[in-house]
């Protein structure tokens, strides 16, 4: 029974890791497509509406010294003397970014998310099995006490040694949760008692 659960868990875990890998590849492909639209170094000019011309955003891959309205805005929407007035309204900024750093950050984030998802599935599938085993050992310990008094501690010692050796993170987490729940109940009770006393 346990080997069946472990086999299912491994199949599910490998499926999840493959889906996370596929999602990472898909995201990288989209980022590469987006990188074609916007270079890592660019000049961006935001021009507000002027007379009958609507506002517009212009991007161009040029050097920092040429990052101004006259070099970036093409085609110029106004002619003649209005060009200078139009360019004074435009706000141009030189931008640099590292698309490689962005890609690596996203891959690390997705990897951590995939590992956490895999750990959650592990806890969901394996925790009931561990609880059944520990519950079975406690029943065995009780039945050994009921059977007889010849060597009452020999079997109990073996069962306790096996259950202690299997103590893991899940048991510690469950103990911490139970302790926290008891503390919350005690706090609620003390708050309620104080409220009754004050009334």
UniProtKB/Swiss-Prot annotation:
Sugar attachment sites: 61
Originating organism: Mus musculus (Mouse)
Transmembrane segments: 106-126
The protein's name: Transmembrane protein 9B
General function of this protein: Enhances production of pro-inflammatory cytokines induced by TNF, IL1B, and TLR ligands. Has a role in TNF activation of both the NF-kappaB and MAPK pathways.
Topology of this chain in the membrane: Single-pass membrane protein
GO CC, one annotated term: early endosome membrane
Compartments where located: Lysosome membrane; Early endosome membrane
This protein's record includes keyword Transmembrane helix: yes
């Amino acid at each position: 029974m346990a080997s069946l659960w472990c086999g299912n868990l491994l199949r599910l875990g490998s499926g999840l890791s493959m889906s996370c890998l596929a999602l990472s590849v898909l995201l990288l492909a989209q980022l590469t497509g987006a990188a074609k639209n916007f270079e890592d170094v660019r000049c961006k000019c935001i021009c507000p509406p002027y007379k009958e011309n609507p506002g517009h955003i212009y991007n161009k891959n040029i050097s920092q010294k040429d990052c101004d309205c006259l070099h970036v805005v093409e085609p110029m929407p106004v002619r003649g003397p209005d060009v200078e007035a139009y360019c004074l309204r435009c706000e141009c900024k030189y931008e640099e970014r590292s698309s490689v750093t962005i890609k690596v950050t996203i891959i690390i984030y997705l990897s951590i998310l995939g590992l956490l998802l895999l750990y959650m599935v592990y806890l969901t599938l394996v925790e009931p099995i561990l609880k059944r085993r520990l519950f079975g050992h406690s029943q065995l310990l009780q039945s050994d006490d009921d059977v007889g008094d010849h060597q009452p501690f020999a079997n109990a010692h073996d069962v306790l040694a096996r259950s202690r050796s299997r103590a893991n993170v899940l048991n510690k987490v469950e103990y911490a949760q139970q302790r926290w729940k008891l503390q919350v109940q005690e706090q609620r009770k003390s708050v309620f008692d104080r409220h009754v006393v004050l009334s």
